[in-house]
């Protein structure tokens, strides 16, 4: 499926080159997502262990077997936000449960800037989680093109409170309203 999804090809070519510069695993873009035709980017912190494990899917996807993916899928579905979506990470490589070092963070931010350059139709970025929001504010301020929506992390720690659950739901619904 990966090689038959034209919208994902340019991103996959970028990912392949980027992965050559990393010792950590770099998951693939989801071929079911919009790829370079994305209008909404859901930006999370970093890929989870399930994504890059030998048994895992190898994709950053709402279909992955983890709570963040499930929450993203559920809220997008409830908001009827089905098309023009891409899911990716601020630090696009697996960190083995550790917090990213400053060097890893900078590498992730540089990679993100490259990915944003491959998304000419991007209208909305949903920043999911404190780390992602902080890195965007610190490093991406010059990007005025997409509308930025701040949201809690859809992962288990981020969704502990009912308020965070509702805030995430409202962020997804706002993204839907903005892109129609």
Where in the sequence are the language-model features?
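A polyanion-binding, active-site-adjacent surface
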Residues: 1-154
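Short, flexible loop segments at boundaries between secondary-structure elements
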Residues: 77, 81, 144-179
């Amino acid at each position: 499926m990966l090689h038959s999804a034209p919208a994902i090809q340019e991103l996959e070519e970028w990912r392949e080159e980027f992965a050559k510069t990393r010792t950590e695993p770099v998951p693939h873009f989801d071929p079911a997502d919009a790829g370079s035709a994305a209008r909404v980017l859901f930006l999370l912190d970093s890929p989870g262990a399930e994504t890059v494990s030998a048994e895992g899917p190898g994709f950053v996807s709402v279909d992955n077997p983890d709570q963040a993916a499930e929450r993203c899928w559920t809220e997008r579905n409830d908001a009827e936000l089905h098309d023009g979506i891409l899911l990716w990470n601020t630090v696009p490589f697996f960190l083995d449960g550790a917090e990213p070092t400053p060097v890893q963070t900078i590498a992730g931010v540089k990679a993100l800037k490259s990915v944003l350059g491959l998304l000419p139709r991007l209208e909305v970025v949903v920043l999911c989680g404190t780390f992602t929001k902080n890195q965007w504010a610190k490093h991406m301020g010059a990007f005025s093109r997409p509308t930025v929506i701040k949201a809690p992390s859809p992962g288990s720690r981020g969704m502990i409170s009912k308020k965070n659950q509702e805030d995430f739901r409202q962020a997804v619904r706002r993204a839907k309203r903005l892109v129609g």
